[in-house]
Every structure is written in C-alpha cells, then in structure tokens.
Amino acid sequence: MEMIKKEEGNKDGPSVDKTTPTEIPPAPTDSAGVAAMMKAWQEFATPGPEHAWMAESAGTWVCDSVKQWMDPSQPPSTASATDVVTMTMNGLYQVTDFSSTMMGMPMQGHGMMGYDKMKKKFVLSWVDNMGSGIVRMEGDYDKSTKTLSMAGKQSDPGRNMETDIRQELKFHDDGTYTMSMYGTGHDGKSEQKFMEGTFRRKK
C-alpha cells in the first residue's frame, strides 16, 4: 500500500511519497507468533497508569465564567459551563459531556479521550453542536508543569479548509484546572486564544 501526498503546484494530481514506508508486514501464522500477537493486543487493551490518572477527573465540574474571544481586539464574552466526566470501556476512555453557551446560543459538546499505549500519546475526539465535523487531537502530559497539551486539526467552513487547533489543560494544586483553547488567528498566520475557563468540582 502506497502513501500518497499532493505536492504544491502539482496539477497532475497526487504523487507517491517515496520516503514513507509502503509495506505492512504479514500477520504471524506460527503458534509462537500468534501467541506474541495476542499478548500484544491484550496489553494494548489493558488500562495503564495514564488511564488511572484520567479516572481521577471523573465527576462534575463547573466554571462560573468561561471567556470566549471572537475578536482578540475586543473584550471576551463570558458564560457559565458544566463538564460531566465519566470513564467507560473498562477504564480505557474518558468521556466528557460539556454544556455552555457560545455567541448567545446553547452549546453542547461530547469528547472521548484515551491513552494510546502504542503511540504513547493521549488521543482525543470532540464533537459539538457548533459544527458537523469531528476534531481530533493528540498530545502529552508534562508532570513538571501539570499540563496536558494536545493539538490537531479542525474544519473551518469560513476558510473552507482545515486549520490548527490546540488545547491545554493545566491542573492546579487547589484541585481546579484551567482549560485554554487556541486556533488560527484572523490573519491566517498567528495563533489566537479563543476560549479559557477555570473549572472546579461541583460539591
């Protein structure tokens, strides 16, 4: 199977990327190989320390004032928000149900985050009623700063293309966490913060 990419300025269509590995090794058929493969899959499906860390966030979180910037030169709008976090599928995935308002309209979001033990990355998918696309991000947790940083792409219908998106979750010693969201700025080059809020557990 060949991996292809479309080169800039190539009007004849996609070209083969010769630098990308093109062969997938066959699955083992001998008993030892099959046993090793099954063991690898069992390990892949077993929650690890990263999943236990995600489970610590299970519960209901609230924010009195989520800031939202449509125009960075103007003051942000604010809205309250609620985040309900649960674990599912034997503790492999963290499910988030988010509710707030955006631009005066009710906003509902649904996220699923896991830790891919093969990639050794946190992986996230996100959907909400503000659009029909699925946002996918992945990233790492920095224990020294207590920050989970994830980045990916989102559909931008205004530009008719995918643009960068980035999320930071910074966990504080008082048990709260701050969520910050960043995207491509109006100039198409710089990064712009478009959402930020500090959440606390609902008592």
Enumerate the predicted regions with their spans.
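Central antiparallel beta-sheet cores of small beta-barrel/beta-sandwich binding domains
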Residues: 63-166
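Intrinsically disordered, low-complexity sequence elements enriched in Ser/Thr/Gly/Pro
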Residues: 3, 9, 16, 130-134, ...
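Amphipathic/hydrophobic helical signal segments and adjacent flexible N-terminal regions
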Residues: 1-75, 202-203
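Solvent-exposed loop and beta-edge segments used for protein-protein assembly and interaction
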Residues: 53-57, 88-90, 173
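Exposed beta-strand face motif in extracellular beta-rich ectodomains
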Residues: 175-177
